[in-house]
Regions:
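Pre-Walker A (pre-P-loop) alpha-helix and adjacent loop at the N terminus of AAA/AAA+ ATPase modules
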Residues: 45-82
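Walker A/P-loop nucleotide-binding motif
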Residues: 76-97
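Conserved nucleotide-binding/hydrolysis micro-motifs of P-loop NTPases
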Residues: 115-116, 140-141, 171-176, 195-201
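Conserved catalytic/switch belt of AAA+ P-loop NTPases
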Residues: 140-184
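C-terminal alpha-helical "lid" subdomain
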Residues: 1-30, 183, 190-295
Length: 295
């Protein structure tokens, strides 16, 4: 295969001049798209590898889904294998997208909201038969001021000579173009993310909670009280429980950026029964100044 790129340091340019060394894109390497604001020339910049937690919590169903996506891409002959991971914030969509991207064995091109649709279209044309995995995190936010008609053209494959994987994550599907929904030729796989199952919650607590005697009690507390049982919220709460081992679950909960199902139900570690927490936090003199949960 003819090499289409030139490398100078970490900067990867398309071969429109003779400066630099000829190269191919590296499997598993993340590339950010760079656009010269004067000439609009497109280049790719190496950005290392995707960061993942030391342990990824994955169900057997998750594993089957990931393997199916990879297998379908490998069986495809051209165009895009599209995947949408949608649903609850902090539920592991981005982690799964990264796992799929890594397992694909492809160079990974990160697409952020600063990359205009026509730039993406031009990039696909320049890539030719070089296969990559495109990663769009939080597509719903990106589409707020995005011409999605060009994205639809890209997914239709009219400018695609090779084959690519394209991974999307999305929190709010209401913001997604109706022309992406129920269109398997554009997005073949659509996975909805919901709350963590009790068995998965217990697995996380067994791994992360210092006081193993409290695993069952904290699992019950989470199931009974957390309005949103996402990995993000649960991992943050476990860290609080480890950092403040003498504080009741209720007090930890009251101080965090969490909403309850209603009246807080106490469990083993608890030593008080008072307090009702509404779904929306009330403004008081004890305001939470910083959000301790990512995303």
């Amino acid at each position: 295969m003819e090499k289409k790129f030139l490398k100078v340091g970490k900067s990867i340019s398309f071969k429109f001049n003779t400066d630099g060394l000829e190269c191919n894109l590296t499997p598993g390497m993340v590339y950010n798209i760079k656009v010269d604001r004067f000439t609009e020339n497109i280049s790719l910049e190496e950005s290392g590898s995707l960061s993942l937690p030391s342990k990824v919590y994955c169900t057997a169903r998750d594993e089957r889904f990931i393997n199916k996506v990879i297998n379908s891409y490998n069986l495809s002959e051209n165009g895009f294998t599209g995947v949408m991971l949608a649903g609850l914030k902090g539920s592991g969509k981005t982690v799964m997208a990264k796992c799929i991207a890594n397992k694909s064995g492809l160079p990974i091109v990160n697409v952020d909201k600063n990359i205009r649709p026509y730039i993406l279209k031009c990039l696909v044309e320049k890539l030719g038969d070089t296969s990559v995995c495109f990663l769009f995190d939080e597509l719903d936010k990106l589409l707020e001021d995005y011409d999605d008609s060009v994205l639809l053209q890209v997914l239709d494959g009219s400018d695609t000579k090779g084959k690519h994987m394209i991974l999307f994550t999305c929190n709010n599907t209401d913001d997604i173009s109706e022309y992406l929904i129920d269109r398997c030729s554009r997005i073949r796989y659509w996975r909805e993310f919901e709350e963590m199952s009790p068995s998965l919650i217990m697995e996380v607590l067994n791994d992360k909670l210092n006081d193993k005697k409290e695993v069952k009690s904290l699992t019950d507390f989470i199931k009974d009280n957390f309005e949103v049982c996402s990995f993000d919220n649960i991992a943050s709460f476990v860290k609080e429980a480890n950092d403040y081992p003498t504080t009741t679950f209720e007090e930890l909960f009251e101080d965090m950026n969490l909403s309850s199902k209603g009246t807080i139900k106490p469990h083993s570690r608890s030593c008080k029964n008072s307090g009702i927490k509404s779904k929306k936090k009330d403004v008081s003199c004890d305001c939470c100044w910083d959000c301790c949960c990512a995303g």
